[in-house]
């Protein structure tokens, strides 16, 4: 009898990609399942992202069904309550778990193959470092450093799924880093919902992590050639640790890249979004970064169409883009998410 086959599709950020790699690693570790292309697999696992709304996730389910009508489907990832309800209504035979239940993925797939109904939404936070992984790129190690965040952004539904910050211990992160280095990885992506607050709940900060990982401790000359990519950080946290983090970026092993989402150039909108900084503070932060590291690449995120945004607010956002000259601008239209405070506006 042939081994049941699974295909894992990923949508969204690098944190989601790390989880998709872990899902594949966990599923094949005990040799109970094999991996297959989407059109050939017995089970399709869809690791979804709902940061911009549920419609893209529902489209992913529909397209998966169209591509492989005979496969059973498991939905996981950042599954909000509204997405769960819509999937149950439109696709009642699709099983559902979420990002907090990665440890149950083998059980979920097994029950799915047996025709059982599975809904795993509740769940305590689990540590997602040091899990078996099947990497998308064999030389890139995506290392989750925490889950959840400390922000209360009015438009964000991810907080409903991920919850409050839980930093992974430095020793745990170092263990995965060292193992990945021995396995031949040359590039390390540090990922989470917000790298900027890593360590705040365990008496540390991101500068400690960057300095520890960028100072190689071994004797293998080949393993000394690696780079670290520091993921997204909220400006209010970067402001707290600015000097120490910028000092860590002087190590040649740390990519000169920062993802600092501004979201709006209007203080009125930023206040409504519950972003804990002003437009002036953001502009000064970017100036300080460029002064310390002239070659730094800066990416930012912008939300347009926030419910309280006026024409003048919009012009102020254009102004902050002109003043800070980000190398990368990710622009999104405001999406009303049920359960968020901005949904009431």
What residue spans do the PLM features occupy?
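Short clusters of hydrophobic/aromatic residues that line enzyme substrate/ligand-binding pockets
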Residues: 121, 270-273, 342-345
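Conserved SAM/AdoMet-binding glycine-rich loop
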Residues: 73-74, 82, 182-311
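Conserved N-terminal phosphate-binding loop of PLP-dependent enzymes in the Aspartate aminotransferase
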Residues: 242-243, 325-326, 341-344
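Proteins enriched for Cys/Gly/acidic motifs involved in redox and nucleic-acid/cofactor modification
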Residues: 1-197, 211, 258, 280-291, ...
């Amino acid at each position: 009898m042939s081994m049941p086959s699974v295909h894992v599709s990923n949508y969204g950020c690098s944190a989601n990609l790390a989880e998709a790699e872990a899902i594949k690693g966990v599923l094949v570790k005990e040799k109970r399942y094999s991996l297959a292309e989407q059109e050939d697999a017995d089970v399709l696992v869809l690791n979804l992202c709902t940061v911009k709304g549920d419609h893209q996730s529902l489209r992913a389910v529909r397209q998966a069904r169209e591509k492989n009508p005979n496969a059973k489907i498991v939905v996981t990832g950042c599954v909000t309550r509204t997405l769960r309800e819509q999937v149950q209504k439109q696709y009642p035979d699709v099983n559902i778990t979420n990002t907090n239940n990665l440890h149950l993925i083998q059980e979920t797939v097994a029950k799915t193959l047996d025709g059982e109904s599975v809904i795993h939404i509740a769940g305590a936070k689990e540590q997602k470092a040091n899990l078996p992984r099947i990497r998308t790129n064999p030389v890139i190690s995506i290392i989750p450093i925490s889950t959840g965040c400390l922000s209360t952004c009015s438009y964000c539904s991810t907080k409903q799924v991920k919850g409050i910050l839980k930093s992974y211990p430095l020793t745990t992160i170092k263990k995965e880093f060292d193992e990945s280095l021995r396995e031949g990885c040359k590039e390390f992506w540090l990922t989470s919902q917000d790298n900027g607050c890593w360590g705040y709940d365990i008496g540390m900060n991101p500068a400690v992590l960057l300095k520890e990982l960028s100072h190689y401790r071994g004797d293998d000359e080949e393993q000394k050639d690696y780079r670290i990519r520091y993921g997204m950080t909220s400006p209010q946290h970067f402001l707290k640790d600015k000097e120490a983090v910028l000092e860590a970026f002087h190590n040649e092993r740390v990519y000169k890249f920062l993802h600092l989402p501004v979201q709006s150039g209007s203080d009125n909108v930023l206040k409504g979004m519950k972003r804990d900084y002003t437009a002036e503070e953001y502009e000064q932060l970017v100036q300080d970064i460029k002064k310390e590291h002239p070659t730094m690449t800066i990416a930012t995120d912008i939300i347009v169409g926030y419910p309280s945004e006026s024409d003048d607010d919009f012009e102020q956002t254009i102004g902050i883009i002109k003043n800070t000259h980000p190398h990368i601008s990710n622009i999104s239209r405001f999406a009303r998410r049920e359960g968020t405070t901005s949904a009431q506006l």
